[in-house]
Amino acid sequence: PVVWQDGWPRLANGGIAAPETFEVAGDAPTPNTSFAYETHFADDEDLWKSGWLCSRRTSGGWWSVGPEGLILKGGDSPSSAYERSELVQRARSHAWHAECSMQFEPSHYNQTAGMICEYDSRAFHYLFVSWDEDRKCRVIQALSSDKGAFSMPLGDAGIAVPDTVESIRLGVSVDGYDLVFSYALDDGEWCVVASADGNPLVLDASIMSDEHVGFGAYTGTVVGLTCIDMWDKTATATFDSFSYQDC
């Protein structure tokens, strides 16, 4: 503790070194570091004041907020250094859960939209809705990049989405090194995204870290929403909710 003498601050113990322990008046409050955020993208919400971040450009007509929610126009791929259509929130702990609700009607396999967890354009996990040309239906798929090395954790067999489904909910849970995706169709039950053997697909969350990425590493992990159209730039995705919760 510090006291003032003749206009100068002095240590209360009269010495020049702070004691290892000291008493304070009253009970010390327990800090609450848990963070939670939820939005339905109201017309009057200031996205930037709500902590949303974007890559390189804040204007240009690639996003808008209306009565139906947040609308993203299809932009470049997650590995692009140019015109990406993406809005993200910072991940604030080592254990957290985020989810969104969206409507998306792709017509080409190069049109995707969904939830992305990333460090930068070299390191990310992406759960998305796209179009399967063989099955002629929408599918839920996943794409990962580890220092620029791409992989499709679900292989070619995405999760089929029936034509009657209007709203698709996507979720991601991170617990330390483990990242697990989930999904729900309309008002149905949540399902964990599974690998080919039927077990939950567990991805490596540690690839999205300063230590792993290495050179040029400073961004921190983010999670959010994106729409990609590498076909004709006509696709749009509507997101009517997003939530984030530290666990």
Features from the language model and the residues they span:
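Extracellular glycan-recognition regions
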Residues: 4-247
